[in-house]
From Swiss-Prot:
GO terms for cellular component: extracellular region. Residues 432-476 are annotated as: Disordered. Transmembrane segments: none annotated. This is Probable alpha/beta-glucosidase agdC. Keywords: Carbohydrate metabolism, Cell wall biogenesis/degradation, Glycoprotein, Glycosidase, Hydrolase, Polysaccharide degradation, Secreted, Signal. Coiled coil: none annotated. It comes from Aspergillus flavus (strain ATCC 200026 / FGSC A1120 / IAM 13836 / NRRL 3357 / JCM 12722 / SRRC 167). The gene is agdC. The active site is at 422 (nucleophile), 425, 573 (proton donor). Belongs to the glycosyl hydrolase 31 family. InterPro entries: Gal_mutarotase_sf_dom, Glyco_hydro_31_AS, Glyco_hydro_31_C, Glyco_hydro_31_N_dom, Glyco_hydro_31_TIM, Glyco_hydro_b, Glycoside_hydrolase_SF. The lineage of its organism: Eukaryota, Fungi, Dikarya, Ascomycota, Pezizomycotina.
Length: 877
């Protein structure tokens, strides 16, 4: 959340496209001392000629390590012989085991040329990666490697960005340097770094390439003058630490990636409800009024959020004593909990440099970043002059745990249920060089003035405590440099190679890259892209420290590869524009399916600027089919809570009704991803990997394996040209079969409160019999089963249930459904008591039998009142 403050400080230098000195004369390396066995290969790499020293000093001696880790994964690591060059710390990215794979059984084959050294990775004699396109460069502050690609490749990934799902292959640059990117502009570096790409090749399969490197980087995708396609890495440091992985289809490739960066965290049942937030709620009374208005409008609100407005002068771990006093905050949270609702607030990393508890305790424990002369490093953010936690400090977790357990104490503080962390790229409003953050804060009115104080709510809020009603109704540290932490003598502020950072210099609007962290002695230059993910890990641990037995929900803005192990992600400060509505689909799909961060969603209706009734109504429907569903907007703009407009309210009620009835399907699919890496939200080509027409689709998607979502894409439209692959589908609302033939079908007369949904043939979907106002109430509803037979007449599905919140489950329900030859087979593990299955609906039917309650030529529903307690068979035809 940056907002209008961007206008107050121009960028320190325009964005510069990665500088391109002539590197073609660089000699590359020669391989020698090659040692090879069935599981691995090692070699020495020696500079093959006179150093070119284009953007630093060429390293004379390197090492090569190749590991056949599994049949589907190959590890190729090129690093300095002395192992002094920085490598991503294992505490951030735990390394996978080297495995027990072998070259004989591996689907991937490694081949190399000795001089100049280059390597290829093949799958069934098909070249997937070929570094012979240019000589390898490994310098003190610059690494370069180029691989050939096939003509017109289908590439995906390389996030975070707001470009199309399928990446451009001409004159395209992806830059990795996390920044506070207000408005999430296209063709620029945004909040996160995910240096992995997927290359989908239809029938021959899908493979991915993950470069474990956290340094600033440009990735170029382009063609040579003679038309040859390539992809090129240009990094400011680190090593080449590649993981190649493959699958017969993109879903399998995504599963393989999860084995490298880690499986995503399972979320609590309630987190899939509707969330409401706004930057600019003036006091606790307005927050309470929003909660009341949702109830009054009959729109289920699961979780209420508060932005930095609750803080005393924007200081973390504080409450505005006049607008958000502790007593009232505890009453608000108590009301929410009494009504089976939840509460979340924001915590930023930057701590106000002032006489306050969080700063004083951090100063005493010496856990803030320091300059090289040992003084406190200071920036400027919302509270004014700030210090930044050093996530590498050995005592940082104790400090963070203590602040959380005190401020968010269930008995004496604000008893939050989840956490929102923001500004953790890290953001710094003070432009580079930030030599006087005090003056900058003063000149830019940081912290901003709060709104006038109110003593009570201006309107009655039935059900809230008496004091919520109108007055008429009631009243320098030494750093030790070790191995793998970075070469000495580098220019950490202005490296010779300039990546295309939209903010200009590396330190502009963020932490100074010359800072050296406590503990191991890592430089911010190398670890900048890890700051947000390290805050995420520490924050998740702090949340578990105060509530050890439950799953913590943490939503972050900044991410690095593997962040899904700890957190979910919202897509940042978007605009209330149709193009942002559309691009949120591609963004969400990339995070959920390719980056293994499945708890993801955009600010519904848009964050910045004034939304419109039509846009918000459409977005209320679309947002319901992401995993994370939150309405949020910016101070100074019109209110956009779903109850503000009648059509938006109706759209939200209809979409939430469907979402909540599907919540166990969502929960089951999410659980599966947390256990296996199999994606829940998926691009269309994930399910139809041999249909080339699907490879570029990013305005439709699958909500799990069973539901095709085809939103209306633009203003003023009441129709959508939806692509239906060669398969059978069923209209969600009517059950009418739709036979796809690999072509578009125009869906017409789509009301503003409606979103087209189709069930994929071959699916069995468990749904609740009706929706509810809270997820707690929802869990008491009975089940229904929808059977949508595929072209072969069969269908399958599953249901997973647990207590919905605990980290460790004492009992679960894990049921598999199969339909074949007119019989429904139910089997599985039945430890947990579940609601009855009151009915089974079979789609695609003509006249039904005597047990059919309803027959209309498209479906029949059979009353069952079945208890899910043992294996069962039900004859349906």
């Amino acid at each position: 959340m940056l907002g209008s403050l961007l206008l107050l400080a121009p960028l320190a230098g325009a964005a510069v496209i990665g500088s391109r000195a002539d590197t073609k004369q660089c000699p590359g390396y020669k391989a020698s001392n090659v040692q090879e066995n069935d599981r691995s290969l090692t070699a020495d790499l020696t500079l093959a000629g006179k150093p070119c020293n284009t953007y630093g000093t060429d390293l004379q001696n390197l090492k090569l390590l190749v590991e056949y880790q599994t049949d589907e994964r190959l590890h190729v690591k090129i690093y300095d012989a002395e192992e002094r060059v920085y490598q991503v710390p294992e505490k951030v990215t735990p390394r996978v085991d080297s495995g027990d794979g072998s070259s004989k059984d591996s689907a991937l084959k490694f081949e190399y040329e000795e001089e100049p050294f280059s390597f290829t990775v093949k799958r069934d004699d098909e070249v997937l990666f070929d570094s012979s396109a240019e000589n390898l460069i490994f310098q003190s502050q610059y690494l370069k490697l180029r691989t050939w690609l096939p003509e017109n490749p289908y590439l995906y990934g390389l996030g975070e960005h707001t470009d199309p799902l399928r990446l451009s292959t001409t004159n395209y640059t992806r830059t990795f340097w996390n920044r506070d990117a207000y408005g999430t502009p296209a063709n620029s570096n945004l909040y996160g770094t995910h240096p992995v790409y997927y290359d989908h090749r239809g029938e021959s399969g899908t493979h991915g390439v993950f470069l474990l490197n956290s340094n600033g980087m440009d990735v170029f995708i382009d063609k040579t003058a003679d038309g040859k396609q390539y992809l090129e890495y240009n990094a400011l440091g680190g090593i080449f630490d590649f993981y190649f992985f493959t699958g017969s289809n993109p879903k399998e490739a995504s599963i393989e990636y999860s084995k490298i960066v880690g499986l995503p965290a399972m979320q609590s049942y309630w987190t899939f409800g509707l969330h409401q937030c706004r930057y600019g709620y003036r006091d606790v009374y307005q927050v309470a009024e929003v909660v009341y208005n949702y109830t009054k409008a009959g729109i289920p609100l699961e979780t209420m959020w508060t932005d930095i407005d609750y803080m005393d002068r924007r200081r973390v771990f504080s409450l505005d004593p006049d607008r958000f006093p502790l007593e009232k905050m505890r009453e608000l949270v108590g009301y929410l909990h009494d009504h089976d609702q939840h509460y979340i607030v924001m915590v930023d990393p930057a701590v106000s440099v002032s006489d306050n508890g969080a700063f004083n305790r951090g100063l005493e424990q010496d856990v803030f970043l320091k300059t090289q002369n040992g003084s406190l490093y200071k920036g400027a953010v919302w509270p004014g002059v700030t210090a930044y936690p050093d996530w590498f400090h050995p005592d940082i977790q104790d400090y963070w745990n203590s602040e959380f357990s005190t401020f968010f104490n269930a008995e004496t503080g604000v008893d939050i249920d989840g956490l929102w962390i923001d500004m953790n790229e890290a953001s710094n409003f003070c432009p580079d060089p930030c030599t006087d953050p005090e003056r900058y804060s003063s000149e830019n009115n940081l912290p901003p003035a709060p709104p006038p104080v109110r003593s009570s709510s201006p309107r009655p809020l039935p059900g809230f405590p008496a004091d919520f009603q109108p007055s008429s109704a009631s009243r320098s540290q030494k750093r030790i440099v070790k191995a793998k932490v970075g070469l000495e003598g580098r220019d950490l502020l202005n490296p010779p190679y300039k990546i295309r950072n939209e903010a200009g210099s590396l330190s502009n609007k963020t932490i100074n890259t010359g800072i050296v962290h406590a503990g191991e002695g890592y430089a911010e230059y190398d670890t900048h892209n890890l700051y947000g993910t390290m805050m995420s890990s520490s924050s998740r641990e702090a949340m578990q420290y105060r509530r050890p037995e439950v799953r913590p929900l943490v939503i972050t803005r900044s991410t690095y590869a593997g962040a899904g192990r700890d957190v979910g992600h919202w897509l940042g400060d978007n605009f209330s524009k149709w193009e942002h509505y559309r691009i949120s689909i591609a963004e969400g799909l990339a995070f959920a399916s390719m980056f293994q961060v499945p708890m993801v969603g955009a600010d519904v209706c848009g964050f910045a600027g004034n939304t419109t009734e039509e846009l918000c109504a459409r977005w209320a429907s679309l947002g319901a089919f992401f995993t994370f569903y939150r309405n949020h907007n910016e101070i100074g703009n019109i209110g956009q809570e779903f109850y503000v407009w009648p059509t938006v309210a109706e759209s939200a009620r209809k979409a939430i009704d469907i979402r909540y009835r599907l919540l166990d399907y969502i929960y089951t699919s999410f659980y599966k991803q947390s256990q296996t890496g199999e994606p829940f939200l998926q691009p269309v080509f994930y399910l139809y990997p041999e249909d080339e027409n699907t490879f570029s689709i990013d305005l439709q998607f699958f909500y799990g394996d069973a539901i095709l979502v085809s939103p209306v894409p633009d203003k003023g439209l009441t129709s959508v040209d939806a692509y239906f692959p060669d398969d059978i589908f069923y209209d969600w609302y009517t059950g009418t079969p739709v036979r796809g033939h690999g072509a578009n079908i125009t869906l017409s007369n789509i009301d503003i409160t409606h979103i087209p949904l189709h069930i994929r043939g071959g699916s069995i979907i468990p749904i609740r019999s009706s929706s509810a106002m809270t997820t707690t109430e929802l869990r008491e509803k009975s089940f229904q089963l929808i059977i949508a037979p595929g072209l072969d007449g069969t269908a399958s599905g599953s249901l997973y249930l647990d207590d919905g919140d605990s980290l460790e489950q004492k009992a679960t329900l894990e049921v598999e459904f199969e339909y074949r030859k007119g019989v429904l087979h139910i089997d599985g593990k039945f430890e947990l008591h579940a609601s009855l299955v009151e009915s089974v609906t079979l789609l695609g039917q003509g006249k039904g039998g005597s047990r059919a309650r309803r027959e209309d030529g498209t479906k029949k529903t059979i009353q069952t009142n079945l208890e899910l307690s043992k294996p069962t068979e039900i004859k349906l035809e």
